């Protein structure tokens, strides 16, 4: 798996904080959640807003920026909490192998193109086979309720 990631700009960091605060209050679309995970070194609780993909009755997290800090922390912790308003749920992470990611990546881009298109070299609506070569650049996890 590729270890690089695209760091957020200063504007994106400010937007993520504001949007994360709103999602934490329970606002946002049905797929918006605040992901909470313990830092792998500090043990501190970190939060970031995410788009949760539901596909064939399963829940998936995709990291459109690559191996970000939340990805590294989540892999180390083995579990995350999704929060929206007063509702919280813990999940165990199951990493998706690269060969199984194309369908998930396509669905993610097609569903959330307005928010994530800039992180993908393909256009939303591209055929699933076009995602084969990209799979290693985008960590993806199935969420399993704890």
Predicted regions located by residue number:
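Short low-complexity stretches enriched in small and charged residues
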Residues: 4-19, 44-50, 61, 96-101
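Short beta-strand segments
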Residues: 30-64
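Alpha-helical membrane-targeting segments
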Residues: 1-32, 117-126, 133-135
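A generic structural signal for ordered alpha-helices
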Residues: 1, 13, 21, 28-30, ...
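Short, functional N-terminal and low-complexity linear motifs
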Residues: 2-3, 37-42, 70-76
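Short, structured beta-strand-loop surface elements
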Residues: 58, 65-146
């Amino acid at each position: 798996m590729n270890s690089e990631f695209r760091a957020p700009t200063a504007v994106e960091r400010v937007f993520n904080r504001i949007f994360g605060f709103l999602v934490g209050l329970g606002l946002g679309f049905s797929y918006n959640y605040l992901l909470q995970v313990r830092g792998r070194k500090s043990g501190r609780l970190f939060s970031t807003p995410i788009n949760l993909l539901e596909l064939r009755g399963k829940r998936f997290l995709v990291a459109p920026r690559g191996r970000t800090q939340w990805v590294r922390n989540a892999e180390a912790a083995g579990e995350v909490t999704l929060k929206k308003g007063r509702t919280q749920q813990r999940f165990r992470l199951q990493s998706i192998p690269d060969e199984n990611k194309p369908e998930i990546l396509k669905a993610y881009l097609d569903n959330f193109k307005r928010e994530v298109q800039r992180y993908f070299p393909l256009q939303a609506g591209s055929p699933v086979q076009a995602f084969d070569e990209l799979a290693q650049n985008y960590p993806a996890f199935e969420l399993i309720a704890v």
